[in-house]
């Protein structure tokens, strides 16, 4: 293979008439099939297929180039002879590959002038401890040269979008910059990366909560979800930003409340500062002009990554029909039968156990299925003898309850990850998974699609759904891009070029819908010829087609924007709010009520409460929220069924109880037992008692759909405790995302007693604890720091800043505080 080193220079692409379709009609597919499934393969055949690959990779056809690259990577991994891949990597600017080969595989006997020259040339692509590809370096240069221009960056996972954010923060550190992230988890991850990068001083505040902002500050760095940014824009109607970065910007295309809100804040920010610089970061979008909201006029430059380093291997395991295992080839759109040693296995957990690598992501759509599968897999695996896992289980058991299902899984090297796992637990177990080699499995949902990075060399897809719909081509590619990140492939100690071929296993079994066609699903999302097309649905985007089906929605969105920020829409001739409560509803993002129709009635009811004096207890608060707002919710509004539950007296009592726990600052462990005790009283009063449990339910009641209720009778104590754990998280989210909006409106109207308002919103009236909450700490941790470690924490209430002493972690460890709380501090430092 030394002959390949004579080609280590740039070769122009050859003109050709060969296409993939024509190639399919040659003898090559049969040869390729034997090669890919590792059938007996003569050396002469290897030489043939490598020669064809060398030809394909130099043609002027992207798909054939990719096929040629696929063959070369597979050939080198089969033979462990990486000379050909070295040549390709140098020619195509894939310098992380060429450098890894140079450092890990013996090339000494094949060195010549070209290899020495390439070695020196590659050094200019070194960034810190890593090496960039040619397009990565070009992207960085483009980003730096476009610091004052609005741009869209379309780049797969691992291409350094986090570094681009840090570069922008460095550029705008003395101005006003906001990074919009779609989830709280990504928000905290982004904040921590900015801190660790060292581009800002330790004393510089990073705003993660609207109330951390002070109007007298000349500069600010904010990391916010769109809803929090909307509240910040409301808090100060004069605030402007010099730069906004929209992470995971493809979510802007969707038609839902969050995407509408994202478009709205961009529109408002652009109106306040027409010279604002916008940076859209996304792993996929076909046409960046589709990211432009209405009522904005900025020009958008685009940088799109076109190179490829990874070439996935797709496996299909048919459990439904028992037809065995296949390698799916995305180039020839064909399934090659395999003997993986799993033909007689009938359950998903058996497939995963047998085929698992060192680190594995298992994808499922529903939280209920995630826990069910994780527990089933745990039954097959032995307990792990690891003091760190034992210690982690002890601390999680103390923080939650010892019967927590997660602990059964963790002892077997499994964690699970979904929206009903408490934030502090999720962050802690993610760290365990990243740092402990004994934890091999993470079972997760589409939360992984929102930028969360976890190491993995294999992925198992057990469900073809995302939410209520199917996994789209875009979501599928985003999902599989989370496997074998560059930092793992090219790690100097643990890296492996076999990870250039990430294994994606589609296990077609009981978690797929009954009428699903597994093979067609894989063809639809994995075929190399599948063309990415943007589905532009958000009515606030310029390129969304408006018709009879969405014109009313556009009108609602226009009314919201113009009432929130008057003057945006020229020749506006729709409605304006006429009352204080109507204006407050708009400013607090209430969209479930036709505010313009109902505001007079809402104001009249509010006035009756105002005459009675300020509200200072949870019973009166819930009653006021129901009478003023919930009774006016439109039956067709998104989430109307969840809000309408509050009209039932039992629900009002229940949420009044939850708010009392909030006011009393109950710990998670305390709330679990209070939940269990509350349900026990219901069961004692009525053996047929049913409770609302949302997506964890199995029956309908009170006119509901989608089985959101369940019976208490017949459940074990462990089942009830685990049901309480997920319901507490979901009910807390419901309160924060729904009820607190109405609390804010009542407070805007001066209807709440101040100390009571603080306790409802924050769980405390202590201003120092509130300051820590605004900085992203949990209530239990904030209270602990205030009570026991105040000397290690510098709290500035007027500036909304919290600075931790370097000695804090050691002091907490010395006092044997719960590791979850210690890591939470570490994550916020």
Language-model-detected regions and their locations in the chain:
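N-terminal helicase ATP-binding lobe
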Residues: 1-829
């Amino acid at each position: 293979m030394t002959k390949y080193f004579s080609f280590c220079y740039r070769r122009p692409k050859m003109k050709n008439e060969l296409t993939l379709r024509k190639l399919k009609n040659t003898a090559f597919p049969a040869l390729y099939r034997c090669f890919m499934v590792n059938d007996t393969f003569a050396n002469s055949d290897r030489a043939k297929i490598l020669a064809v690959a060398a030809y394909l990779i130099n043609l002027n056809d992207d798909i054939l180039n990719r096929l040629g690259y696929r063959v070369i990577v597979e050939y080198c991994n089969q033979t462990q002879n990486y000379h050909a891949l070295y040549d390709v990597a140098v020619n195509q600017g894939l310098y992380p590959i060429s450098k890894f080969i140079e450092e890990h595989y013996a090339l000494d006997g094949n060195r010549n002038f070209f290899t020495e020259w390439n070695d020196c040339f590659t050094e200019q692509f070194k960034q810190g401890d890593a090496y960039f590809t040619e397009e990565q370096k070009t992207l960085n240069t483009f980003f730096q040269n476009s610091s004052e221009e609005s741009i869209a960056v379309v780049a797969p996972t691992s291409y350094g979008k986090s570094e681009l954010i840090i570069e922008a923060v460095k550029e705008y550190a003395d101005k006003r910059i906001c990074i919009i992230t779609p989830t709280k988890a990504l928000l905290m991850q982004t904040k921590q990366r900015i801190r660790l990068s060292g581009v800002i001083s330790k004393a510089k505040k990073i705003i993660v909560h609207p109330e951390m902002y002070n109007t007298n500050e000349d500069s600010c760095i904010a990391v916010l979800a769109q809803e929090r940014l909307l509240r910040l824009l409301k808090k100060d109607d004069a605030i402007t930003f010099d730069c906004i970065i929209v992470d995971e910007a493809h979510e802007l295309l969707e038609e839902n409340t969050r995407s509408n809100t994202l478009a709205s804040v961009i529109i408002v920010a652009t109106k306040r500062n027409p010279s604002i610089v916008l940076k859209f970061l996304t792993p996929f979008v076909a046409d960046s002009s589709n990211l432009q909201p209405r009522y904005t006029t900025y020009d958008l430059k685009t940088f799109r990554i076109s190179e490829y380093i990874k070439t996935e291997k797709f496996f299909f395991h048919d459990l439904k029909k028992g037809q065995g295992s296949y390698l799916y080839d995305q180039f020839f759109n064909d399934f090659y039968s395999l003997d993986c040693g799993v033909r007689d296995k009938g359950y998903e957990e058996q497939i995963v156990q047998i085929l698992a690598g060192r680190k594995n992501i298992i994808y499922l759509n529903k939280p209920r299925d995630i826990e069910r599968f994780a527990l089933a897999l745990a039954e097959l695996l032995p307990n792990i003898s690891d003091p760190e896992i034992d210690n982690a289980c002890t601390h999680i058991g103390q923080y939650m309850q010892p019967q927590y299902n997660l602990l059964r899984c963790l002892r077997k090297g499994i964690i699970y990850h979904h929206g009903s796992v408490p934030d502090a637990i999720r962050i802690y177990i993610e760290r365990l998974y990243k740092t402990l080699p004994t934890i091999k499995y993470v079972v997760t949902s589409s939360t992984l699609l929102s930028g969360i990075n976890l190491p993995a060399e294999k992925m198992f897809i057990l469900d073809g759904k995302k939410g209520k719909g199917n996994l789209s081509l875009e979501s599928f590619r985003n999902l599989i891009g989370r496997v074998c990140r560059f930092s793992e492939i090219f790690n100097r100690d643990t890296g492996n070029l076999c990870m250039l071929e990430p294994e994606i296993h589609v296990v077609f079994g009981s978690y797929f819908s009954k009428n699903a066609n597994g093979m067609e699903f894989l063809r639809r999302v994995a075929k190399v010829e599948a063309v990415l097309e943007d589905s532009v649905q958000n009515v606030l985007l310029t390129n969304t087609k408006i018709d009879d089906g969405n014109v009313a929605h556009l009108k609602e969105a226009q009314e919201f924007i113009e009432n929130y920020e008057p003057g945006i829409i020229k020749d506006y001739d729709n409605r304006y709010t006429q009352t204080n409560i109507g204006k407050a509803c708009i400013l607090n993002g209430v969209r479930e009520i036709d505010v313009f129709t109902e505001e007079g009635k809402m104001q009249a009811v509010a006035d009756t409460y105002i005459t009675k004096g300020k509200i200072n207890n949870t019973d009166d608060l819930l009653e006021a929220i129901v009478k003023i707002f919930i009774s006016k919710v439109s039956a067709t509004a998104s989430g109307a069924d969840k809000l309408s539950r509050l009209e039932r007296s039992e629900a009002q009592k229940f949420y009044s109880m939850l708010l009392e726990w909030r006011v009393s600052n109950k710990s998670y462990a305390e709330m679990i037992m209070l939940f269990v005790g509350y349900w026990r009283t219901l069961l004692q009063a009525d053996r047929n008692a049913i409770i609302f449990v949302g997506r964890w339910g199995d029956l309908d009641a009170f006119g509901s759909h989608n089985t959101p209720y369940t019976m208490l009778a017949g459940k074990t104590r462990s089942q009830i405790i685990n049901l309480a754990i997920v319901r507490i998280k979901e009910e807390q989210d419901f309160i924060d995302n729904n009820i607190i909006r109405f609390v804010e409106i009542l407070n805007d109207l001066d209807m709440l007693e101040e100390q009571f308002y603080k306790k409802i919103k924050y769980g405390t009236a202590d201003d120092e604890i509130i300051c820590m909450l605004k900085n992203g700490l949990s209530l239990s941790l904030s209270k602990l720091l205030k009570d026991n470690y105040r000397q290690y924490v510098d709290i500035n209430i007027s500036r909304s800043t919290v600075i931790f002493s370097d000695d804090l972690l050691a002091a907490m460890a010395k006092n044997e505080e719960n590791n979850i709380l210690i890591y939470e501090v570490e994550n916020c430092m």
